C-alpha cells in the first residue's frame, strides 16, 4: 500500500485512533493507526502552538457524555497477531502510574464531520512558514480551501515538496516521487524488522529534527499481522513508523503519544512519501480534572457491560481478555477527549496460521458519578 492510499485510508477512518497511532481489522485489510479514537501523541512541535495541558480549575466543571460506537461485523477496531502479551504498541502508560485524576478536553476542531476547523488562517500561515523554514523551502502565497467563510486548509509547494496545513493543526509534507533514504536503511510497510525500523526512525528523527523539535524522540514500532485471502499466502507484518516527544512527565507523555506525534510513510519503492505531524490538542479546551477508576474497577465495569465498542460481539468471558491499557480517544469527530481503559478481548473469529483477532472495548476511566449516560451494552443487546 503506497502512502497516498495509506493516507486516504486514514482520512476515511479518522481518526484514528488511534488512536491510535490504532489499527483496524476490516475485510482482512490492514488500515493505519488512527487518532483515537485513536491517533492516537504529543509533543510541543517547532511548528505547533501548544495547548495548556493542565486545567484552569481542579474541580470537574460538567457531566460527561459518552459517545456511541457503530458496530459493524465488516469493519471494527481490533489487533491481529499471535501473542498479544508480547505486543508493544508504544503506549507509555503502565499500571504503576499513580493517577487519581486526569484532564478532560473539549475538542474545538470538529464540531461536526467534515473539513477540520479550529485555527485561524493567520495561525495556519504561521505553521506553514515555520515548517517551510525548517525544511529549507521558499514558498509563495499558499492555496486555500474554505468551508463556508472560514479557511480550513493551506497548501504550498516548492521543488517537489508540498506542505499542507489543516485548521486542526495537522501538518503534512508530501514528497513528489518519494524521497530516497541512504542505501543502508530498509524502509517498507511490511518487510522491515524491528531493528531496521528503529534504524530508520533514528535517521528520520535526526534529519527532521528542526521540523519536529522533539527534546526526547521516542519510537513507536507497532503494527499487526495481516493475512491475504489469496491462495497460498502467508501472514505479513504491517508496521507503522511513529515518533513522539517523551521529554515530559507521565501525563504529558501519554497525551503526546495520543495527540501529537509524527508519522512517516514509505512508498512501494521504500522512499519517504509522506510525513504527517498530528496536533490533536491544538484547538482543545481543558475543562477540568476528573477522578478516575482503577484498572480493577474497570475490569468490573467491563464484565457488567459498561463499555463502548465497534466490535459486533459482547464480552461474555473475562478469561478472553488479553490486554488492558489507559488511553485517550482522539478521533476528530470526538466531541470530548477523555480517558478510557481499552481492553483487547480475543474474538471467536477463525484465523489461519495461528493468528487471533482481539477486539477493542472501551470502559470510561472517569468515575461514574461524572458520567451522564454510562453505557450498558448488555442492557441494550439486540
How would you label these PLM feature ranges?
Residues 55-255, 259, 278-285:
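Preferential activation on post-signal-peptide N-terminal prodomains/segments
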Residues 1-30:
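Disordered, charged N-terminal biogenesis/targeting segments of membrane/secreted proteins
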Residues 95, 122, 126-131, 135-142, ...:
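A eukaryote-biased signal for long
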Residues 163-181, 252-279, 349-382:
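A short, surface-exposed beta-strand/turn
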Residues 199-341, 345-352:
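Segments that shape or occlude catalytic/ligand-binding pockets
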Residues 10, 35-61:
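Single-pass transmembrane signal-anchor helices and their membrane-water interface zones
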Residues 17, 135, 139, 306-309:
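Short, flexible helical or helix-coil boundary motifs
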